[in-house]
């Protein structure tokens, strides 16, 4: 295994708006949270997996007390049920891909349009490859592994237009093409707060679609209102079969979510199966943790926001003469989002009759929200209430809890 040491903060979005002490209702289509998986749990298998070098290698924090991100989200306990994400597909809209790395070389990968290839120049140039390895790195006894090592992947590059005049047209087409995916991972975005964009829209009497098109266009992504609407429609249609996961900004000084992660604020039809990702470094011994936000807060997206530890981790890197290069010390919400996407794939395998909204509900309603005070709560369709706040959303992803019957917290 070739190791390259590097710390880099990568794409994401913002967060922070104020919430009152209230209850928000999100209606699930049935009372599916009342029961857990019917699969048999093998604690020995879970413990064995957690002890492997490959499982431990995702973590690379300089903090001596840093916890393993995979163990924090109880990924090993999902493996105790025999879950790997087999039969599921994660769509990744990103840039900097390579199929030759050891972590992905045995995986089924569908590619849409022209890809921006990984170059190995730095971790940013290999961004899509790193994200893919965190979500889906193979459990093959070497290197590291991802959350859902058995999944297939669908790749598309957000910084290509694939012959279209406007970028959002390509994003819409790529989203539509991922029709077999159970989740779409978005570890990219433009740093511009949703509340600021809302102010721009109101002061200029723009439509919401025109407003986001203006921001895309001014940020170098050629767009118009029609193409922006096409992208929103594609994201809405995707939720018929999959969950949309969006990384928040890495700008920790932000006071609200960035507009891309917070698109459901402008387009309420997107709220059905949408999760935003906040980066939380977790240190200390089990039961005595310290939680430090390393990104923008959840803000206006708090009621559909989840956290995980994406601080100083390991991910696959590109090298033209080797297939086992790994970047060490990469950080960002970009690497929280694929942990959530991997969790969606594991749950889809465990609950094959769940629709995307139900998978989303299960993850949000089971997150660990015990380490902060709640500003409000979401009431799910079966009466389960789960508290959240503007900083951490619903709290830390817990895959094991999501596999169990869920009660209010």
Model-derived features: positions:
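Short, small-residue-rich loop/turn micro-motifs
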Residues: 108, 148-151, 188-190, 308-310, ...
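Extracytoplasmic/secreted envelope proteins and their assembly/folding machinery
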Residues: 75-76, 128, 132-135, 168-171, ...
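Residues immediately C-terminal
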Residues: 98, 253, 369
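C-terminal subdomain of the subtilisin-like protease fold in secreted/lumenal serine endopeptidases
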Residues: 45, 67, 181-185, 276, ...
